Structure formats: C-alpha cells, structure tokens
C-alpha cells in the first residue's frame, strides 16, 4: 500500500512539473470599430473613422481597438474601391489603455465619387482571427457655383440655372420675396426640387452681366459670371451684404453622383460689422471673430459656445438679419478664419437636399419680427407656467 501511494505521489509531481513548463496561450477576445461613434460633436471615441466625412485627396484613418492587451496581436484592413479588391493595409499600434490596445490604419487618398467598403481584422500569432464590418463610405468634394443664367420666372419666383465649377450636374437657385423686405434663397444642387414662391411683387431687369430684381424695399443684383449677389436696402440706400469673385460664394459637398453632404455660403464682411444672435449663449452676445455651432448640447459647466438653445439666426449691425432654415447641424464662422468674410456650413438630409435661407432687412425690431413671421410665434403659456421655477444645480 505504501508503494502504491508513493507511485501516485510521483505521478502527481511529474504532471505538475509538465504543466508548469507549458506557456499559457491567451486568446484574442475581440476587436471593435465604430465609424461614427456616438454621433456627438464634442465627444469622439478612439475607434472612429477620421475624418468623419472623407474628402477627395485626403488620407483616411480607420481606428480600432483589440482586447486584452497581449503581445503577438496584428490588425489589418481588407477593402474594395468601387467594387475592386485593393491590397490589404496593416494597422499601426498606437497605445494601450486599461485592458485595450488601440490601432490605426491609413488608406487613400481617393477621388470624388469613389465608394470604399472595408472590414477590420485582428489575430494573435496568426491564429484566432476575428473581424468587424463591412463598413462603407462615399468620397466627396466641394463644388461651387461658377456662373448663373436666368432660367424661368413664375409668379413670385425667379429661378436661375447654375453652372458648377466641375461635374455635369444642373443646379438651380430660386430667389423669392415672402415680403418686400425679406429675400429668400432656395438652392438645389441636383436641380430637381420644386421651390416655394413668395408673396411680394417684384420687377426684374437683365443685361449681359447681371440680373436685377427689385421690390419696394430691396434691390438684389446677381452677377452672372463669376456668380455673386449684392443686396441693397432701397429705403436707406445702404448696401446690406454682398459676395462674389472668390468662387466659393455658394458651395456643396458632393460625391458627384447625387449624394450631397453639406452646403456652404459666404458673404463679405467689413471689419466694422458686428453680429448678434444664435440663441442662448454664455460667452457674450457679439460674435464677430468667433465660430458658432448650431448644435443642441447640454453642457453642465464651462459651456463656452455650447448651448441647448441654439438658433441659426443672427442680426448684423449693417441693418439685416440672416436666418438659415434648417434643423440640421450648422456652423457659422463669423470672420473668425478670415477677417473679411463670414461663412455658414450646414449638413443635409442626403435626400432631395435644399439650402434654404433668408436675408431680412430693417431695424432690430423689424428684423426680429420678420424672423418670427418665418419661424413661427410662441403660444401663450398656461397660467401655471408663470409660477415658481426651481433648479437643483
């Protein structure tokens, strides 16, 4: 019996020694890539695509993470361009954080209209391959209005045919007047949207260089080539705003095949012009020299330009207001990047995209009144709403 116990003990010791000499092989648990994160303008995840909107000529960075942290891991991409397989691209390890390793792969640059489909792969020592995808994106590029011609006149609406600086699209620009002192711009880069007519009467004159449209309160001069526009208040004779000559007065970000991601408008601005508005803000009411996001965001402290009551409307000290009629994210660069101009950029729905904005002439009271006629007036609040309001902050 003692001999048997001794043999059992020896076998156990031998097995223990064998197991102690074996190096444990840990598996790759997972890989993650989320191209657009949580769709938060100010809070980006480390596993997004960058830039979020791939533009022609730019490198595109595909970021991902693997876990747990272990030596021997590899990450790479397979992708197609316009349906054609491309050479695989290896990802570079960037850093470790917590239980995760973070990676980045660069692809591109690509041309306008390219459609890229990709899948992210990972393995450990050539085994236990895991993947996530496929994902895809369209490559876009800015196109701009190069020239315009008088297209058609309907009751309350002037339609201009737009020639872009590239591509073969047939954009159209509609000009109308909801009232004599309000000018409305409606722009369709695909030229397939029916514009709304205005209510105010107007007269129109045309020569080889320009188109002049007048109401009892406004005179709008459209330069045909290169495209530009000048808006003048007939009551005061003052030039309200103008643009022209740069080739970027009216632009749209497109794949050239029907997808439109953004619009951009530009106007000249003298150094004396001041801008007020954009809803509730926490860092001053005058916005010249600042870039303002139109994005509803609940920032608890240190709000800066972040606001949960953002309004795409401003009043200019030159005697006009501009109202961008959109519920999508927009950004107003109020002579921040360029001290001689302001620009506004706005996202689109992608389907039947239309840029729609108004220039309203008058005193501050008249401009705000004109804006409220367009946006809608608030209803009277019930009696109980005038009682105590209390916050726990």
Where are these regions (language model features)?
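Glycan-association/targeting regions that enable binding to alpha-glucans and other polysaccharides
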Residues: 26-182, 186-190
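Hydrophobic core
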Residues: 16-21
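Short beta-strand segments
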Residues: 87-89, 133-135, 171-173, 200, ...
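Catalytic and substrate-binding clefts that recognize carbohydrates or anionic sugar/phosphate headgroups
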Residues: 144, 164-166, 205-383, 389-393
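Short, Lys/Arg-enriched N-terminal segments with co-localized hydrophobic residues
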Residues: 1-4
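Sec-dependent signal peptide recognition
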Residues: 7-14
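Contiguous, structured surface segment used for ligand recognition
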Residues: 162-164, 172-226
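Beta-strand-connecting loop/turn residues
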Residues: 13, 58, 99-101, 156, ...
């Amino acid at each position: 019996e003692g001999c048997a116990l001794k043999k059992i003990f020896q076998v156990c010791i031998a097995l223990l020694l064998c197991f102690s000499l074996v190096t444990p092989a840990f598996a790759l648990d997972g890989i993650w890539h989320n191209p657009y994160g949580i769709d938060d303008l100010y809070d980006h995840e480390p596993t997004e695509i960058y830039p979020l909107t791939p533009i022609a000529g730019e490198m595109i960075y595909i970021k991902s993470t693997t876990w747990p942290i272990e030596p021997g891991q590899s990450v790479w991409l397979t992708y197609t361009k316009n349906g054609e397989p491309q050479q695989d691209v290896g990802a570079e390890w960037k850093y470790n954080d917590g239980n995760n390793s973070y990676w980045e792969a660069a692809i591109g640059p690509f041309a306008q209209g390219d459609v890229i489909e990709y899948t992210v792969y990972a393995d450990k020592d050539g085994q236990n391959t895991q993947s996530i995808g496929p994902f895809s994106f369209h490559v876009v590029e800015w196109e701009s209005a190069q020239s315009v011609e008088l297209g058609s006149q309907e009751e309350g609406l002037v339609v201009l045919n737009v020639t872009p600086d590239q591509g073969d699209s047939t954009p159209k620009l509609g000009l109308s007047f909801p009232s004599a002192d309000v000018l409305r711009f409606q722009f369709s880069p695909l030229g397939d949207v029916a514009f709304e007519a205005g209510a105010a009467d107007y007269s129109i004159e045309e020569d080889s260089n320009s188109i002049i449209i007048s109401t009892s309160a406004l005179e709008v001069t459209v330069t045909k080539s290169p495209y530009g526009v000048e808006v003048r208040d007939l009551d005061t004779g003052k030039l309200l705003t103008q643009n022209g000559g740069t080739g970027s007065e009216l632009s749209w970000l497109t794949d050239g095949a029907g997808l439109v991601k953004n619009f951009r408008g530009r106007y000249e601005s003298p150094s004396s012009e001041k801008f007020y508005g954009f809803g509730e803000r926490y860092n001053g009411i005058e916005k010249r020299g600042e870039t303002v996001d139109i994005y509803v965001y609940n920032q608890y402290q240190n709000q800066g330009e972040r606001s949960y009551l953002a309004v795409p409307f401003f009043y200019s000290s030159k005697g006009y207001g501009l109202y961008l009629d959109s519920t999508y994210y927009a950004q107003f660069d109020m002579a921040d990047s360029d001290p001689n101009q302001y620009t506004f950029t706005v996202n689109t729905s992608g389907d039947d995209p239309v840029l729609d904005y108004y220039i309203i002439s008058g005193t501050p009271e008249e401009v705000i009144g004109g804006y409220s006629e367009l946006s809608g007036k608030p209803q009277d609040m019930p009696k109980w709403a005038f009682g105590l309001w209390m916050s726990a902050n």
